């Protein structure tokens, strides 16, 4: 959780992260963020936040028309009301609102900072 960035699949390779969206997306995985019992809590180290922010800037420069979002944001709108609510999420990750975080321009998300 030192913020190192590794490559699982190359950009252009089909991922296995969000059913129905794998062919046209790049998946990013943050290591950690879960409790010992396996519950998501979305807390990451300062180094991870900095690396994620930098990686997203690089990917956005390479793919300027791409939509940056979390797995949960690609869940179906089951009740058709135009809003994807927590009850409709197929996955919780990344356990924080990606759009709000990016709009805040706060590199380290203090609400989801792992405290040692």
From Swiss-Prot:
SUPFAM superfamilies: N-acetylmuramoyl-L-alanine amidase-like
Any GO molecular function: N-acetylmuramoyl-L-alanine amidase activity
Annotated N-acetylmuramoyl-L-alanine amidase domain residues: 2-73
Single biological process term from Gene Ontology: peptidoglycan catabolic process
InterPro entries: Amidase/PGRP_sf, Amidase_domain, EF_Hand_1_Ca_BS
Similarity annotation: To phage T3 and T7 N-acetylmuramoyl-L-alanine amidases.
Protein's name according to its UniProt entry: Uncharacterized protein HI_1494
Organism: Haemophilus influenzae (strain ATCC 51907 / DSM 11121 / KW20 / Rd)
